Amino acid sequence: TGQPTLSLEDLDALLEEDEVEESMASLNSSEVADIIGIVAVLGFAFFSFARKSVALKYISFAMSIAYLGLYKSNLVSIVNIFAILQGNLPGFRHSIPWYLLIGFTVVSTVLWGRLYCGRICAFGALTQVLDRLLPSRLRIDPPAWLDRRLAYLKYGILGGVLVYFLGTGDFLIYRYVEPFWMFTLNGNAVMWTLVAILLVATVFVRNLYCRYLCSVGAALGLISNFTVFRIRRWGECQTCKICEKACEWGAIDGPKISVAECVRCDDCERIYHDQKKCVHWIVLQKKPRAQIITSS
């Protein structure tokens, strides 16, 4: 008597804590290294996003390509969506990096939008680096009306793939609708031919796969409609076209930013805060002068 008693809920909580401690203790050095690696990539990607630095963004690209792409071949895939739909998730103990990547992707999308697409995806990072290295004279920019229609293609692909999978249970369809497998260097002649065509086309149309064909991008685009922290717009954005012309993703239409297409690349946000480029700041700087001239 007089001794505190534990409820069933308290006992369950203690057991869960013991299981977590046991799980962490049972991890081998390779698994710990994987956790450190994914945390480093995700952490630096977010740091570069917060700082709005072009140099840091390209370092983040290099980390994603090297680690998530070439070393681990670990990208968010339509296969992950299949697994979630089936409730067929990997065991937590030996799949912590997977849960960290998926968790970060979903949470960051809800908070800021398609940050994964614009900063972390190894294939997206690769195409953005290629776009910077290749001569701009090779580039073909689709007219705005066509660009906005082509952007719907990825949603059709996502819907078609999901219907196919739910009807057949064949997850191998992913090999023909996304090129992420190429980092494993394991594909047949048809798959490599499709990837070759895609990469050649990307030389001429920047971010072609990400903008028009990526089913994962489509899924994250749908989630982005609920994004909490969106890019602000000034009143002058009604008529100014500077950010719209600078956007490489076709996500800006006049004063509106399509959150489903925006990958938070930072380009417009750097202009947005540049007092020498952004019309909003230029107008504010001229107002005091105008008032002085009027009063005199």
Which residues does each predicted region cover?
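Non-ligating segments of multi-cofactor redox enzymes
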Residues: 3-254, 260-296
